From Swiss-Prot:
Protein name according to UniProt: Histidine decarboxylase proenzyme
Originating gene: hdc
Record note on cofactor: Binds 1 pyruvoyl group covalently per subunit.
Secretion signal span: none
Keywords carried by this UniProt record: Decarboxylase, Lyase, Pyruvate, Zymogen
Requisite cofactors: pyruvate
GO molecular function: histidine decarboxylase activity
UniProt propeptide residues: 2-11
Catalytic residues in the record: E215
Residues at the site labelled Cleavage (non-hydrolytic): S97, S98
């Protein structure tokens, strides 16, 4: 692209007195609006407006009491993980591995930025050195997970869910295990708990490189103490982010930051548990787009979006 032309298209927008923000001209159309008023849809489905997509983060768990059909038990526990927290129930989940590319944007970071991110209130959990010596700052993914709940809603308070029966490409993995009812040594495939991770690493050159999703999931077999499992997962974060650095090395991609989060559950005796990590690639419901248009989502915070939608916050009921 002609650099002078691009410079002319770059703009500074006024957000109030002594409050200006710079908006860089996009090189790629990232508009992502579904054909439905109240439903999001899967990326690549017919009828969408724009060439872009939106990545939404979710980690959840679900459990069910074991019956005499372990296959059906696995289906139900997976379904419960889908509907818990941010609601992604009733979808045909297709698997991608696993990037948010140059046409994609992240809900809660790029679009309707979570207030804690917009105000630069979050602090790194730790740092790792990347292949070129650049530090990779690792942040808690809680703001992005909360943003997903605010967009999709919950099972009891649904908002802009994906269309029932929609075909939705997702970065996803899951783990399923049975905790025996009897107090006996565990057999292969049995566990006391299950867990899942999601990590999203943002490239430092997002016009030319993709953001990386890493999903991980597994079984907890040591004991039935949830605090021990939580401690293991807190330590395991560094293994997950090690894989981020190594994938960056493979493609010579340097990341600006990583968001990482996990979910876990200790099953009751006689239960089957599922831990799901997923990031749906969606186009936004028409009514989820402010009246100022899709680009306005790049300029507003999550709380401003909630105000525009006239929603109360689901994760912080005292705030909109």
């Amino acid at each position: 692209m002609n650099k002078n032309l691009e410079a002319n298209r770059n703009r500074t927008l006024s957000e109030g007195i002594h409050k200006n923000i710079k908006v860089r001209a996009p090189k790629i159309d990232k508009t992502a609006i579904s054909p439905y008023d109240r439903y999001c849809d899967g990326y690549g489905m017919p009828g969408a407006y724009g060439n872009g997509y939106v990545s939404v983060l979710k980690v959840s768990v679900g459990t069910v009491k074991k019956t005499d059909d372990i296959l059906l038990d696995g289906i139900v526990s997976y379904d419960r993980a889908e509907i818990n927290d941010a609601y992604v129930g009733q979808i045909n989940m297709l698997t991608a591995s696993s990037f948010c590319g140059v046409a994609g944007q992240v809900w809660g970071h790029d679009l309707a930025t979570h207030d804690s991110i917009a105000k630069d209130e979050i602090k790194p959990l730790y740092e790792l050195k990347q292949f070129d010596g650049t530090p990779l700052k690792v942040y808690d993914a809680k703001p992005l997970l909360e943003a997903g709940i605010e967009l999709f809603g919950t099972e009891k308070n649904r908002r802009f869910t994906t269309a029932p029966g929609a075909h939705v490409i997702c970065a996803n993995k899951s783990a399923t295990a049975y905790r025996p009812k009897e107090n006996r040594p565990l057999k292969e495939g049995e566990a006391y708990g299950v867990w899942s991770f999601i990590a999203l690493s943002l490239s430092n050159d997002r016009d030319h490189c993709a953001d990386l999703f890493i999903e991980d999931a597994g079984l907890w077999t040591k004991n039935d103490n949830p605090e021990d499992l939580k401690k293991f997962l807190e330590d395991h974060r560094k293994a997950v982010t090690w894989s981020v650095v190594e994938c960056g090395r493979d493609s010579h991609v340097v990341f600006e930051r990583t968001y990482i989060g996990f979910a876990y559950v200790i099953m009751k005796p006689g239960e089957i548990g599922n831990a799901l990590t997923c990031a749906p690639y969606v186009t936004l419901a028409r009514d989820a787009v402010p009246s100022e248009g899709f680009p306005s989502l790049n300029r507003i915070s999550l709380s401003q979006w909630l105000d525009d939608m006239n929603f109360d916050s689901l994760v912080n009921p005292s705030k909109k």
